[in-house]
């Protein structure tokens, strides 16, 4: 009973992270079936904690760069250790480890994620090769972690791997989400953090990034129907929320306020997804 209570407490702690940090993903996860909802929130929580180490919270607390790196390294060690042992005194790590052990999330996904987070402490400007490596570790593997949850949560048997088509779709959706966030945060990344992920300050480059985003979103949309039924509405909502952001980014010059989707539009997108609609495709 104590172990079960601890697991439940860890899951609840992880769920509080997404409620505090993300209206878009928080809205989408509410459309997930109960089989997977808590698991995905636990994945998000670990990702968010690591991101906060490198994106400002640790620095705001007075940690110098070397201490931020040490803290990130310690979180990675704690995570990998908990995945092996099944326990962590860190509630967010414990919740993630329980999900990883059940759903077949292994070090081959976790280590690239932390490698990309570490890059944020070491690299200020990316070329196309380092951009692609960063996006794989910071976003595509997160999509693959969620995919492992979708196909394995609640299974009585050993975890299985998703189909190659679903793997490709998860990667392209994760890449699109990350590139959209890069464009939304271009000024803040440059001014506050001194980072350039895209080199997209020229209009032609910005257009090329948006074209790539649309291609990734369209490719990912084609795979949603192959997901388990209790995951499709949530993925459709997340896809369409970011597709709406991409549309609004294309209409902006990137110099004004951070582009966002108004709450009534978010609600309409979520309602459409909940009704069973397919993801929108720009180039259908």
Model features per residue range: what roles?
Residues 1-177, 183-284:
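Catalytic cores of Mg2+-dependent Asp-rich isoprenoid enzymes
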């Amino acid at each position: 009973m104590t172990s079960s209570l601890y697991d439940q407490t860890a899951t609840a702690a992880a769920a509080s992270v997404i409620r505090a940090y993300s209206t878009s993903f928080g809205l989408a996860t509410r459309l997930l079936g109960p089989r997977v909802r808590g698991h995905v929130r636990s994945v998000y929580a670990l990702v968010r904690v690591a991101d906060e180490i490198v994106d400002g919270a640790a620095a705001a607390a007075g940690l110098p760069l070397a201490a931020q790196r040490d803290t990130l390294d310690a979180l990675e060690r704690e995570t990998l250790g908990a995945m092996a042992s099944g326990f962590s005194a860190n509630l967010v790590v414990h919740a993630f480890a329980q999900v990883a052990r059940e759903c077949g999330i292994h070090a081959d996904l976790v280590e690239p994620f932390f490698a990309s987070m570490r890059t944020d402490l070491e690299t200020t400007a990316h070329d196309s090769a380092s951009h692609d490596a960063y996006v794989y570790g910071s976003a595509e593997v997160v999509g693959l972690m969620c995919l492992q949850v979708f196909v394995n949560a609640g299974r009585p048997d050993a975890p299985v791997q998703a189909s190659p088509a679903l793997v490709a779709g998860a990667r392209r959706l994760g890449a699109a989400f990350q590139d959209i966030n890069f464009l939304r945060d271009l000024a803040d990344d440059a001014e506050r953090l001194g980072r350039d992920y895209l080199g997209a300050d020229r209009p032609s480059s910005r257009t090329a990034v948006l074209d790539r985003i649309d291609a990734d979103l369209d490719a990912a949309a084609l795979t949603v129907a192959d997901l388990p039924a209790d995951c499709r509405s949530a993925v459709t909502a997340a896809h369409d929320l970011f597709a709406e952001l991409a549309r609004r980014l294309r209409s902006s010059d990137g110099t004004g306020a951070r582009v966002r989707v108004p709450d009534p539009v978010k609600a309409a997108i979520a309602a459409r997804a909940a009704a069973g609609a397919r993801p929108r495709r720009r180039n259908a």
